[in-house]
Amino acid sequence: MLSFPNKFKCSSWYRPGRLFIVFIVVALALLTLSCQKSSLSNAPQSGKGGGEIIGAGSTFIYPAMSRWISSFQSSHKGVQINYQSIGSGGGIQQLKKGVVDFGASDAALDDKQLQEMPAVVQLPESAGPVCITYNLPELKSPLKLSANTLAGIYLGQIKTWQDPALRKDNPGVELPKYPIVVAHRSDGSGTTNIFTTYLDKVSPAWSKQVGKGIAVNWPTGLGGKGSEGVTGVVKQTPGGIGYVELTYAKENKLPVALVRNQAGQFVEPTADATTAAINAFSNDLAHDVRVPIVDPPASAKDAYPISGLTFLLIPKQGKDPNKTESLKQFVQYVITQGQDQAESLSYAKLPSGLQQQDQTLLAQVGSKSQQASSGGSQ
């Protein structure tokens, strides 16, 4: 019988029965690992099919949009939304190029623009005042501005704060001797569209010399990019005046002017005053949500005259059905529960009639039976 040195003797670990068991265990482990790897590669990833939803556009709506996104994502863990506050003009262009999944604009698309875009719906999701903010530390009471005075300032015709037109609007108020420094948007802006639509309506001189739109040739002033830029110019410049969404003025502790409406009332820019402006145009809006709500008639005595709707622009047929469905859920949230959040940020809640119109428009998103561009007349 052959003998081996002790170090070569078979230990109990190498017994044939044990070897068979080890082989089975190793084989099962390898099989399990292979199955796990296969299932991981085939399992839906977080956000797969939907991915990140990207929107861009209005700075006017950015404070509300940020709140909406945060609240929606807290209850929809698999959805990620990224909104880029680049101005309404930029948002429209990004959507037109297919770079983003939705746009936001304070300037509704006209018929020509709709024809140039992929099939989209545009639905109003909020409204708010474009406030006139200023930097006059010596002034203890709110500045009052009539339509002609405001137009004269932005035309460069009224150059100092002690101009007779300003004295007339503010009787008994000691106005400072500062020169007026006008601030305006330097980028394509829906806020500019609302503001210039107002000036175009109330001032024949403005209408003839400048007109209206998301970008105009300003007769005077310093340009700032975004509402943040305009706010910055005003805040840093004694004697400065600019137009921004109300939240930007509040956050920077800047005062806002009372603007005279057709009823002769100097009205503060508030959510309620914006709602009064919307209600003044309710019949027109029922036929076309794009109707401007600036300079309402004298019957709307409590209405703020420089108010505007802001719109979401949504492709009817997104590139990814899952992402489109998530976007629809987000918009549904915005036009329902999100309205209370908007109101807390000084935006006006949409009246029930506009909310119902929004539901009709939103139903067209993802519907293959609807291919024509929408968002104009109903």
Task: For each feature predicted by the language model, list its residue ranges.
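N-terminal secretory signal peptides that target proteins for export/translocation
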Residues: 1-15
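A general, composition-driven signal for non-globular sequence regions
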Residues: 9-12, 30-31, 62, 93
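Bacterial N-terminal signal peptides
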Residues: 21-32
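Flexible loop/hinge segments at secondary-structure junctions
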Residues: 35-378
